[in-house]
Amino acid sequence: SGNEKPLYYQENKDRFSKWNDKIVHYITEEIPNDFSHMLEKTKYHVAYNDVDPYGTKFIDLPIRFQRALYNRNNSSFGIEKAGATDDDLIITSDADEIINPYVLEDLSWFDPNNHYVALCNAYYYKLNFLYQDDWMGSRLCTWKHLKNTTVGQHRQDHANAYKIENAGWHFSFLGNAENFKLKLSSYEHTENNTAEVLSNVEEKVEN
C-alpha cells in the first residue's frame, strides 16, 4: 500500500530471546516507488519488463503490486545473509502462514529438483472459522532452485508445484474490527479497501 509498517520483530526481540541466536533479521530499508530502472533482471528480482503468469508486464501492474513483489523478492538477500548453501531446504511463507512440522519430520518425499507448495487450512476472522482447506501457503525448495528464480515467481508458479496435503495453517483477518480495517489499508490488495467492504467489517467479525 505504501504505508509505513512497524518492525514487529525488532520491537519485540525480547519475546524471542530464546531463539534470537537462530534468527537472522533482514530489513528492506527502502522500497522504490518507480521500477523503471529494473526492467532488466537484477539479483534475486524479476525483470520488470517480463510478463507475470496472468499476461501483464510487471512494470504495468499497479504500483502497490510492484512494491509488494519487490519486498517479497528482496527476502532472498536475507536467506543469503543467513549463509544458505545450494542443498539447503528453504521454506518461504507469508507471516500468517505456518507449515505443519510433521511435514518436515521425514523428508524422504523431497526431491531437490522439484518445488512444493503446502496446502493449508485457511482460517478467517476467528481461529475456528475454516474458510478454505486447500490454501496454497508455504513454498519449499532448495536454495539452488530458489536463487535461480525469485521468491515471488516461486509463489505464483502453481502449475509446476507439487502439492503437499494437510501441510499447514493460514490465519488471516483475525482480531477485532480495527485489526481487520488496518490490514485492508496496509496490504497490496487495496481494491478491497472500499466503503462497502468497510461497512460490513463489524458483521463479518461478529458472525
Q: Where do the PLM segments sit?
A:
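Conserved catalytic core of nucleotide-sugar-dependent glycosyltransferases
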Residues: 64-65, 97-196
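Active-site-proximal specificity loops/subdomain of glycosyltransferases
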Residues: 2-92, 101
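Charged phosphate-binding loop/patch that engages nucleotide di/tri-phosphates or the phosphate backbone
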Residues: 196-207
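Generic serine detector
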Residues: 1, 17, 36, 75-76, ...
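Residues that form generic nucleotide/phosphate-binding pockets
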Residues: 78, 183, 187, 204
